[in-house]
Amino acid sequence: MEHSTEILYNKTEVYCSAVHRFGSDALLLARFAEPKRLQRAADLCSGCGIVSLEWHDRGHRGPCIGLELQPEGSALLSAAVEEQDIGHLTPVCADLRTFRQGEGSFDVCACNPPYFTDGPQSQNAAHALARHENTCTLDDVCRCAFRLLKDGGRLSLCHRPERLAEVLAVL
């Protein structure tokens, strides 16, 4: 698979494609939601895995999953994990609406979910899935996180300010 490589501060490599790339919002989310060194963490809607790879770059070594629906995004994370021998990070290509592994065992979940419910969509199906709630709604993300999190666990989201009331209502 053809990809470009972005190098994080401590030399962790992130593999990106034209569809699966990242912006500053994902890096801010990773820093905000950063798990403690050995906590169990989940990066939901992981795309190329930037959040979980940033956690690794900053010293997280606990069990971590990068859960992504789109095979290309999951494959990019898998390649980065394999080539850099990041054994504690497990890419998972699955639908978060039906994902059940590790229920009630995670300390931290983070998600940079699709932002838009309506409006013009990209002609590229992968772009549309990443940006619009076609197959993954805010409610779906929260339901998955609350299945995965143990008591006292925390969910961190990055979302648009105009949807703050909806985010709070769903939580």
Predicted segment positions?
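Mobile active-site "lid"/loop adjacent to the S-adenosyl-L-methionine
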Residues: 113-140, 144-147
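Conserved SAM/SAH cofactor-binding pocket of Class I
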Residues: 28-103, 108-111, 117-122, 162
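Short, conserved micro-motifs enriched in small and acidic residues
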Residues: 20-24, 135, 158
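Conserved Class I SAM-dependent methyltransferase catalytic core
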Residues: 137-171
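Class I SAM-dependent transferase core
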Residues: 1-36
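Conserved short-loop catalytic and cofactor-binding motifs
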Residues: 17, 65, 129, 152-155
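Residues that form or flank phosphate/diphosphate-binding pockets in enzymes
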Residues: 24, 100, 166
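Charged catalytic carboxylate motif
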Residues: 25, 76, 140
